[in-house]
From Swiss-Prot:
Pfam families, per database record: Conotoxin (PF02950)
GO molecular function, one term: ion channel inhibitor activity
Residues that span the membrane, as ranges: none
Highest taxon of source: Eukaryota
Signal peptide: 1-19
Protein name, as recorded: Mu-conotoxin cal12b
Annotated InterPro entries: Conotoxin
Organism: Californiconus californicus
Propeptide: 20-42
Entry-annotated residues carrying 6'-bromotryptophan: W59, W79, W80, W86
Length: 87
């Protein structure tokens, strides 16, 4: 019974993994993008802002940690664009 409850809770939280793992940008709260929007855009890097495509997301350069990602939300502390590290 306990295992079933744990599995149900995990399945309910699965779509909100981005809210749990990437909720800050360099110490400041960030605007959370909806999970379904991340599914549609996670493979796209915007070269106009200097994103580098690796696997299914973008990686941010350490020299310009704000505004050079695949989106305008900036980088996380680990230099990943929000919503792409664990996709």
């Amino acid at each position: 019974m306990k295992l079933t409850c744990v599995l149900v809770v995990l399945l309910l939280l699965l779509p909100y993994g981005d809210l749990i793992t990437n909720n800050y940008i360099r110490g400041a709260a960030r605007k959370v993008t909806p999970w379904r929007r991340n599914l549609k855009t996670r493979d796209v890097c915007d070269s106009l802002v200097g994103g580098h495509c690796i696997h299914n997301g973008c990686w941010c350069d350490q020299d310009a940690p704000h505004g050079n990602c695949c989106d305008t939300d900036g980088c996380t502390a680990a230099w990943w664009c929000p919503g792409t590290k664990w996709d």
